[in-house]
Each structure stands twice: as C-alpha cells, then as structure tokens.
Amino acid sequence: MRMSLKLVAAAAALASVFALTACDDKGSTAKKAEEPKAAAETKTAANEPLKVGFVYVAPIADVGYTKQHDIGRLYAIDKVGKDKITTTFVENVPETADAERVIRQMINDGNKLIFGTSFGYMNYMQKLAKEYPDVKFEHATGYKSAPNMTNYNIRFYEGRYLAGMLAGGATKSNVIGYVAPFPIPEVLQGINAFTLGAKSVNPKIQVKVVWTNAWYDPPKDTDSAKTLIGQGADVLTQHTNTSAVASAAEAAGKMVIPYNSDMKSVAPNAQIAALVLNWGPYYAKKINQALENKWENKPVWMHLKEGAISLENISDKVPADVVKKMEEVKAKINSGEFHPFTGPIKTNEGKEAVKAGETLPDDKLVTMNYYVDGVVGKVPN
C-alpha cells in the first residue's frame, strides 16, 4: 500500500503549560513526564515483556480519535497477551519539541516499539529513529520513514463517502456543516469524499466548512458547530479529535455523524450514524511482528474492507432507501468495483479534477489541495 500524506500540517497551537499523564496497562498511577535520563540499554533481556509506548495528542477520556487509539492499545494487549508486552501511554502531548522529549523519555524507560499517533510528531520521530536504530517507530498519518520507522493510516475517504450519503439523505435544509482542523490532504480527502457521497443522493446539498487550526480544542469545535448551525446546517460532522461537535448538535436539536468514535453517549438524539476507526488489529499485528523479529518498515494505508473504518448505529432518521443504496456502494468499494474519486469530478471552481472514467491514483490523493463541487468557499493557505 502507498504511504499517506505529502504535505506538512501546521503544528496545533496548544498551551505551553500542560499536564502529561503516563499509565501502563496494569494500573492507573499518574505521573508527570520526566526529563530525559541517560540512554537506556537497547536490548531487551530474554523472556522479558516487550515494552511498547503510545504517544497521544489528546486525552483518552474524551471519545474521539485518541480514544480509538487507546481502544486499539487495549485490544492489542488482549490479543498479544499481558505476559508478552507492557504498554505505556502519554496523553495530551502537543506537536512540538515536547513530543521529542516525551518519546525520548519512553526510549530511556526501555520501550522498544513506539507508536506516535499524531501527524505533527513525524519529524521528531524521524530524528529519534536515526539516534536509536534498535528502537522501532510507527507514525500514524504521516509519510516519512527510516530503516526502523514506518507510517500507517486508514483510507478515511472510503468511509467518508458512505457517511456523506447518509447525511445527504437525512438533511432537510440541504446544508451540511463540516468542522475541520488543518487543510492537509488527509482532511481534504475526507471533505471531498463526504461531499461527493452526499451529492450522489442529493444533488442540491452544500457542504460548509469551518477550520479550527487545531486537532483538539473543544471550545473551538463548539463555536465552529454553532457557526455552521447559524449558516443553516442541520447535519454536522467533524475531522477534529473531540466530541464537542456532537454535543453542540445535540444541544441545538440538529443531526450529527461523528467521526473517530461512536458518540451516542454525548449525542443520543442527534447522532444518526457514527464513522468509527479501528486501530486494534494493526497494533496487535505490528507488536507480534516485533516479538517475532519480523517487524517491517512497510507503509500501510488500510481499507474499509479490512474493518479499519466502519459506519455504525445508523438511525431510522436516515431514509431506508438511502441506507440500502449506501450498503450497495459499500459492497462495491470493498470489491474494488467503485472508488470514491472516480471521474468526472470537478473542483468547486469549475476546473476538471478527475477525467470521466479515470480514478485518482494514490500519488494524487496524497497531494489533494482543492474542494470538489458542492463545497462552499476556498481552501485556506
């Protein structure tokens, strides 16, 4: 599979003072991330559990992107076995030099396999990979690699197309609101696939986007959702890492298709479906590879058909005929008969993006920098 992104996102602007929490899979003792110590021994003694570290950009307490990664960590512990691995995670790590400090501390604590789960960790992980060739590094949603560093992602756009179909069928106002973090290819793929899916069942729809310039900022997400509702949106979705958009939809009596996690707990009436990410099987696979000395630095871009992303808890607020059509399209995506970015596709400025009968190849997907027809506005610089 091809590697994912090709453009570097601006780092999320987060407070300079923050609390870092580290926990293992056997307890919940909290501690502040320590300053780096002298380099630890790089070889794990025979029969000792493999130490595996996870670095998170947001708290695991909030349903969303980081929560799904932690569910994946727990899945891996269950599948691989507590006798074989010990896992540690640090949450609320910003995409700054603090990420390097936290990862270096993990290395000094003896972790031999480290998963960095946010795009902005990429350069720090690559730097450390060169310094510590006996440690294996896995970076989510990035594109840089090294002999001991690879990257992994999910083809979110496949699920986004299907979610867009449901939103297009459910909307009454024909305005759908999309809260987005940074205008990088991964996010634009999602916006565009969602819009194409919505237009396939409802050509009248418009998708309006508000950019937060942050992966995790609940107040910004709330304000953005309120702005979109004020602009006429009656269905919302998001690419950010919080549950705030779902909560705002619930409070306003609107509909929402949350991304990352099922958010029925915060939006019991508003949620009409949930686009859920499943990282667990990948984590279990790569941890087992490391244990068996078969780890590979092969970039992976996982598909819908692999169960890496799924639409769950579809509400009866979505017309039955739209759900039926969505299931048919899902089957075609899984079989390879249909690709969300098969032409003809035009940008919202009327330019040809994909010719009729052609399918956008991966090297074009990972450099996407435009909106398709149906999205309102211009992509910010």
Located regions from the model:
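C-terminal motif of bacterial Sec signal peptides marking the signal peptidase cleavage site
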Residues: F18-A22
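A residue-level marker of the well-folded mature domains of exported/periplasmic proteins
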Residues: D25-N381
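Bacterial N-terminal signal peptides that target proteins for export
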Residues: M1-A10
